[in-house]
Each structure stands twice: as C-alpha cells, then as structure tokens.
Amino acid sequence: MPLSRNSSLKRSPMKTQRAKPSDEEKQARALVRVRSGGWCEMRLTGCLGEATDFSHRVGRGQGGPWSASNGLAACRRCHSWCHSRRTEAEDLGLILRSGQDPTVEPVAYQNAGFVVLDNLGYLWPVLDEEIA
C-alpha cells in the first residue's frame, strides 16, 4: 500500500543499547569520583572544571581495566583534548599504551606535578628524579 501525503508515519522510541555497568565499572567510577571530588583531574588549558567523563588511561579497546588507577575524572574538553592530541597526552601520562601498567606509570595531576594512582582511589606524589 503506497503512502499518501496525508498519512502520518508511526515512530517508535529508540532503544538504548548500552549494557548495565559491571561491578568493576561501578566501583572504579565511585573511587575516581571520591578522589576527584567531582572536579576534573586533568586541569588542562581551557578546562571546564566539573568532571563529567571517566577517561581511561589504557583504553578499553586495548585491554584497559575498569580500575581507579586506569581512570581519571575529566571534563568533556580535557577528555577530548587527550584524544585529539594523543602524543602530548601520552607525555603527561593521561593516556597510556596497551601493556603499560597504570599503577606504575605517573600522570600529571591537576597541574600539581606527577602522581601515581592506585586501585584504592589514592594518589602518591612522584619525586622529579623518579620521572624518566
């Protein structure tokens, strides 16, 4: 049956395809949220301040785990910057390569120097001579 100009199309609502978060994801997100206090942990130039994203240091597609050491709370602008300027983000430890250990690799933290993140949601300052 052909459509006429006066007939209306029925639209159905789009269904979300996102799976329910795992326990590991929930725990990692909660620990990072507490550590950051809801603020962007990257604090790059142009930072929006409030954290809205969970930024993986080792990407999920590269085998990166859901863990507090592998995640940073980020505003959308800082998170986008990391993906558009990958080499610079790697130099700052904001993005790691597959196989790198996020519990060992230092990360530039809120313009306050380099720290090492652990899986309990803590951060540990790194002395300048420890950064190679």
Q: Which stretches of residues belong to each language-model region?
A:
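Short linker/helix segments within small regulatory modules
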Residues: V58-G71
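Short, surface-exposed beta-edge/turn micro-motifs
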Residues: G37-G38, N70-L72
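A short glycine-/small-residue-rich loop at the edge of a beta-strand within enzyme catalytic domains
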Residues: A19, D23, W66, A73
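Short Cys/His-centered divalent metal-binding micro-motifs
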Residues: T45-G49, G71-L92
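A boundary/linker detector
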Residues: M1-W39, R43-A51, E90, L96-A132
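Histidine-centered divalent metal-coordination motifs
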Residues: S55-H56, H79
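Glycine-rich loops and low-complexity Gly/Arg-rich segments
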Residues: S67, R77-S80, S98-D101
